Structure formats: C-alpha cells, structure tokens
C-alpha cells in the first residue's frame, strides 16, 4: 500500500441496490500484489526462463568435461580390398613402374573401442560459459522487470477500481437526492404548485443517473475481472477493493537505476564478452586430449582354416587446431559486434535521457494534481452547500427548479473532477516510483 499516507476526506454516502459488491471479499492492494507474486502466469513463465538459463549455464560448463563414446564396427567383405604392389618387391630384376594387384585381408573385420575426448583449452568453450553466466543474469533482470510491470499493472487497476467505486458512491448519493426532489415536486404538482414539465425534468435526471450507475457498475466489474486476471486467480472468485482512497504527501524519492537500464548494462557486458571471444578465437588455438582403447578382430569362415582372432589397440594423444585464415569471416563478425556495442551505449544514454524527462513531467503532474484535489474538494463542499440552499429556497418560493438543477449539475461536475484529480495524482506518483526504480519499495 501507499506509505506516508493521509486519508482523504470522503463525503459520507449511502448505498442502495449494490448488495452484490458489498458481499464480495475486500482485498487490500498489498494482498493483490502478494497473491500475484504467487499466481501470476507471466511471472511463472519468467521464473521458468530463469531455470532454463541456469540449465544452459550448466550445459556450457559441461563442455569442459571429458566426452566418452563407445564404437563398434563390423564389416563383411564380399570382395576383399585390392592393393597394387610394385612387382620389384618380389623380383628385384623387374623394372620400376610395374605393379601387381593383390587382395589383402580376411572377410570378417571387427573394430570395437572406447574413445575419450577432453578439451584442454578452447576459447570458444570458455567464452560460451561466460556468455551463459551473463545470460542468466539477464534472465533474472527480465524477471525483475516483469515483476515490476505486474506490480504496476495491478496497482493501476486497483486505483481505477477505487475511483469507480467512489464514483458509484457519488452517483448513489445523487440518485437519492434526486428521488427526494422528485417526491417533493410530485407533491407540489398535486397541490397545483408545480408544472408537469418540472416533474418530467427531475424524472429525466433520475433516469440519467440510473443509466450512469449501470455503466459505471459494468466498468467496475470489468476492472475487477482484469485485476483477477493479473493476480492469477479464478474469475469465479469474488474480489472487491477498499473504497477509502489515500493521498501521499509530495515526497521526493531517491533515484536508483531502473531495471531497463540494468538490462542494457548487462547486455553491454554480454556484447563485450562476445567481442573478446571473437578476438581470442582469431589468434588462439584449441587443444584437446584424445585417448582410445579397443580391439580389432579378423575372421575367416572357410574350412578347414576358419578362425576369429582379436588384437588390442590403444593410444593417447593431443589435437591442436590453429586458425590461419578463414576468409575474414571472424573479422567481419568483430566489426559487427563493435557496432552493436556502440548501439547499446547509445541506447543506454537514450534511456537515461528519456527517464529524466519523464520524471520531471510526472513530478509536475503530481504537483498539479495535488493542488487540483484541494481545489475540487473545496468545490464539492461549496456545491453541496449551494445545492442544499437551493432546495431550501425552492421550498420558500425564492429559487426555481432551474436553480436546483444547475446546483445539482455543479455538484456532480465537482465530484467527477475530484475523482479524476485523485487518479491523476496516484498515477503520477506510481509512475515516478517506476521511473526512479523504487516501485517495489
């Protein structure tokens, strides 16, 4: 809820025909926000995104672990492989350049081995790990941003519901006053002291108030449905808001970095890390440890010399891959990344400049709204007094029905302006908190 708040003076009102709203469970703003943190589906999606980023970070780190694979290969040669052998190997007197085709091997060949590969140094793997860590930070910042947005949306909906609820209270009070006036005018007509058109004018005003009440009531129900949707609770659940409005003093909040600015900074960190990885991959080699152990089998299935024999084989070694020239692909990627970093820095400056302008505008709007609240509150009291005096003067025969209707319209206009001023104030205050990065405080 709002802090450092003083309760606004709300004129005592009476309620008629609004039993449905009264029967609903009343939720405070804090209850709505606390429930949304638990049930809001947008927050659940972003929480899952954080978990996904955590697993991606673990996936990147897993590339440093050794990879072990088992391989089995069996070949049956219908035709044995043929090799060309120099004939002077068998007969030195044969001149060079003469060959003889000879088939080597046996039909059955079996190879089975276990192979291990482990990166000893790979700049791309280490860069991917650093990127995954930064991406995880970005996911958490995105969650904070969505959390703040949900808080902002729920608070705005709650304020709108409060304004509509108070508007209904005003309409109820005005409708009661109109009904009283209508009864008095009907009595005067029966006594031939008023015209039929006077009664019709008041009846028209009563009908208009009933229509306004119905429209505002429908808007109120729609706002409550949107509030339930943002909280994440079923539409069937009854929810109502506190009718009493609250107004803050003109506090000056301390400005902190907004989540949007922190996201831009984290993205800048990611871009610079990607640039570092590209520079490393251009000049540094990759080194892998490789090892293999297995067996090779040879078989012959013709009698009487059929056999199947296996011979062990194993090795340990290093693989080194050094980039010499890749067609300037890496260079072009580096140039692109530098421009992305430049755009990111410009975006950070733009966010900061825009934030300052919006804070100044919102603070000005808040100051104006607070003064308007004071003025319209006085106008309501004055309009109420004029209306009551007009009723009294009409009974004394001094004021006309037109005077009463004008006073009634002035009262309703003052009430509407009062509620609009409160809404402007609350929205401006909430916007300032959002712009200064303290909306969750």
Regions found by a protein language model. Give the residues of each.
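Sec/SRP-type N-terminal targeting helices
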Residues: 44-48, 61-62, 120-147, 197, ...
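Acidic, low-complexity, intrinsically disordered peripheral segments
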Residues: 69, 78-80, 87, 417-441
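A small-residue-enriched
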Residues: 34-120, 257-327, 332
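Amphipathic alpha-helical coiled-coil/helical-bundle segments that mediate oligomerization/assembly
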Residues: 161, 199, 216, 366, ...
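Bacterial Sec-dependent N-terminal signal peptides
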Residues: 1-40, 419, 425, 440-441
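Periplasmic alpha-helical coiled-coil/stalk elements that build and connect Gram-negative outer-membrane
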Residues: 55, 143, 147-257
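Extended, amphipathic, non-transmembrane alpha-helical segments
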Residues: 167-188, 215-226, 360, 372-394, ...
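Short terminal targeting/anchoring segments
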Residues: 197, 396-420
């Amino acid at each position: 809820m709002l802090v450092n708040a003083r309760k606004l003076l709300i004129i005592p009102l009476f309620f008629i025909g609004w039993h449905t709203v009264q029967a609903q469970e009343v939720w405070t703003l804090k209850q709505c926000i606390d429930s949304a943190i638990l049930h809001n589906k947008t927050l659940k999606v972003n929480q899952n995104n954080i978990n996904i980023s955590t697993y991606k970070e673990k996936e990147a780190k897993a590339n440093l672990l050794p990879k072990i694979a088992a391989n089995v290969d069996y070949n049956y040669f219908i035709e044995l492989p043929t090799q060309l052998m120099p004939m002077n190997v068998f007969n030195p007197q044969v001149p060079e350049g003469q060959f003889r085709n000879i088939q080597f091997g046996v039909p059955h060949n079996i190879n089975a081995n276990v192979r291990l590969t482990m990166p000893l140094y790979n700049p791309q793997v280490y860069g991917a790990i650093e990127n995954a860590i930064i991406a995880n930070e970005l996911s958490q910042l995105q969650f904070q941003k969505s959390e703040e947005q949900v808080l902002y949306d729920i608070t705005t909906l709650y304020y709108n519901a409060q304004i509509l609820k108070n508007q209904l209270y005003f309409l109820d009070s005005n409708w009661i006053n109109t009904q009283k006036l209508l009864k008095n005018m009907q009595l005067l007509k029966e006594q031939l002291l008023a015209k039929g058109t006077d009664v019709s004018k008041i009846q028209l005003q009563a009908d208009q108030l009933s229509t306004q009440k119905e429209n505002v009531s429908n808007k109120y129900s729609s706002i409550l449905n949107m509030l339930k949707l943002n909280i994440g609770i079923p539409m069937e659940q009854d929810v109502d808001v506190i009718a009493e409005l609250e107004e803050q003093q003109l506090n000056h909040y301390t400005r902190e970095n907004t989540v949007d600015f922190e996201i831009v900074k984290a993205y800048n960190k990611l871009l610079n890390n990607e640039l570092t990885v590209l520079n490393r991959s251009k000049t540094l080699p990759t080194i892998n440890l490789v090892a293999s152990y297995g067996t090779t089998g040879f078989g012959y299935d013709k009698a009487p010399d059929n056999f199947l024999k296996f011979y062990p084989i194993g090795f340990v070694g290093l693989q080194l891959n050094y980039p010499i020239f890749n067609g300037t692909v890496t260079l072009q990627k580096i140039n692109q990344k530098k421009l992305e970093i430049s755009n990111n820095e410009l975006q950070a400056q733009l966010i900061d400049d825009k934030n300052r302008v919006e804070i100044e505008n919102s603070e000005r709007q808040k100051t104006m709204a607070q003064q308007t609240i004071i003025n319209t509150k006085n106008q309501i009291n004055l309009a109420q007094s004029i209306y009551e005096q007009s009723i009294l003067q009409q009974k004394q025969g001094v004021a006309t029905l037109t005077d009463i209707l004008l006073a009634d319209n002035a009262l309703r206009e003052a009430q509407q302006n009062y509620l609009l001023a409160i809404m402007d104030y609350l929205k401006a205050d909430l916007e300032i908190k959002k712009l200064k990065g303290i909306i969750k405080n």
